Amino acid sequence: MLFGRRFHVRANYKVRTTIALHLVTPAGTLLDLILRVTKDQIWPDLLYIVRHGESAGNVAREAALEAGEHMIDIDVRDVDVPLSDLGQRQAIALGRWFGALPPEKRPNIILTSPYLRARHTAGLIAETAGMREDAYSLFVDERFREKEFGVLDRLTPLGVKNQYPDQAEFRRILGKFYHRPPGGESWCDVILRLRSATEMLSREYCAQRVLIVCHTVVVLCMRYILEHLTEEKLLAIDKKTEIANCSVTLYEHDATLGPRGNLRLKLFNFVAPLEEAGALVTSEPDVKIGAR
């Protein structure tokens, strides 16, 4: 029988765990199990957040706007919208940039939205960067998917006003942060699912180098969570900045930020890898973005 026996377990990735077991009575009728977990670091070393390359939906939306159309002409589910030729070149250019980084700066964990354009971007980045299959892990995570627009799917802003004037008015009153179209999501809904994903980053990928390939609203909402922004600050960033395709937002762990350190924003909407490679920089919103 164990009395006050203490076990110390040194876990991976700078995590210190102490387990104390105390049997209070010889009969063992009471087991006092104390699990104390302390972490020197609770965040990844590096967190890259990348918007996918230009998609066929981006191109179709731009054409619909120029023609004054109400609907965006695309014949597949938004989940299945592929990259355009330019989008593939953008992803390849970004992959070369990652490949030129020192090994300790390259991602070893890739998390991607299940949407085809994001998965294709993630695959091209890994392939072009020359990442060996045994040097990284890639996971598809639906929490990083595009914001869902419900009945407003594939409508241009003009189409929303024409077909759903009540929703256009609700959005004007509530603002994009809180407005939830029927069958769709508000920005708050996206933030709710991303909070779960952010907890996973801390729990499973502490001290790792993580790349997330996702969508415009996800990039912005991750900033909202990680930097504890307000609605006003987030919407000010959104108003000022169009998130470019294959742009990089980077957070680095800074041990000086609090007792366990924290993530510090180092890059936002960084497009130099595309410019250096001569790939056109684009920022057209996604196909469903008429009421983003």
Tell where the protein language model's regions lie, with residue ranges:
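Short glycine/proline- and acidic residue-enriched helix-loop micro-motifs
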Residues: 74-82, 168-188
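Active-site-adjacent alpha-helix immediately C-terminal to a catalytic or transition-state-stabilizing loop
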Residues: 119, 195-260
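Short beta-strand scaffold positions
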Residues: 112-113, 192, 213-214
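Eukaryotic N-terminal low-complexity, Ser/Thr- and Lys/Arg-rich leader segments
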Residues: 1-45, 258, 276-292
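Short, solvent-exposed aromatic-acidic interface loops
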Residues: 265-277
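Short, conserved phosphate/pyrophosphate- and ester-handling motifs at nucleotide-, phospho-/glycolipid
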Residues: 52, 87, 215
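Phosphate-coordination/substrate-recognition cap region in phosphate-metabolizing enzymes
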Residues: 4, 27, 32-48, 56-57, ...
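A solvent-exposed, charged loop/short amphipathic helix patch at secondary-structure junctions
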Residues: 62-78
